[in-house]
Regions:
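Helix-rich terminal scaffold detector
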Residues: 89, 99-125
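Catalytic strand-loop segment that frames the active site of acyl-thioester-processing enzymes
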Residues: 5, 13-17
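Short, small-residue-biased leader/transition segments that mark boundaries at the very start
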Residues: 1-8
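Glycine-rich active-site loops that engage anionic ligands at enzyme catalytic sites
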Residues: 24-82, 91-97
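Short loop segments at secondary-structure junctions
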Residues: 14, 77-79, 124
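Solvent-exposed alpha-helices and their adjacent loops that cap or buttress functional pockets
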Residues: 16-17, 62-66, 111
């Protein structure tokens, strides 16, 4: 079964984004995301790969208690000005489960196989 995705479109006007700049794209809708879910705004692959545009914060997060208009902050990674046309699909929204946790401050942690090994500590193959 093909999964449906919500494509986010600019609704108002054409917007030109200069190289190295960010513009907030107003899409003209607000959502009531159910409690326990979060909305994640991702780049559309064509916008990023072909035109150099991607969400400025890499992944936009829409909490379930947010009720305002959804906007996408698009950053121009290319070396030239790029125009986003009115109605153009600019991003995609994915709903995902969201788990909250209560953390407790501790003086020590349980040992693990990995331990304190950070970046690159698990090998490359």
């Amino acid at each position: 079964r093909r999964q449906r995705q919500m494509c986010i479109r600019d609704r108002d006007k054409d917007i030109t984004i200069n190289p190295g700049c960010t513009e907030f794209i107003h899409i003209g809708i607000a959502l009531e995301i159910p409690t326990g879910l979060v909305g994640l705004i991702y780049a559309r692959s064509g916008m990023a790969c072909k035109r150099g545009l991607a969400p400025a914060n890499k992944v936009g997060v829409i909490d379930s208690d947010y009720r305002g208009e959804i906007m996408v902050a698009l950053y121009n990674h290319s070396g030239e000005a790029v125009t986003v046309s009115k109605g153009e699909r600019i991003a995609q929204l994915v709903l995902a489960p969201f788990i909250t946790a209560d953390f407790t401050e501790a003086d020590s942690l349980e040992d693990s196989v990995r331990g304190e090994g950070g970046f690159g500590s698990t090998g490359t193959h």
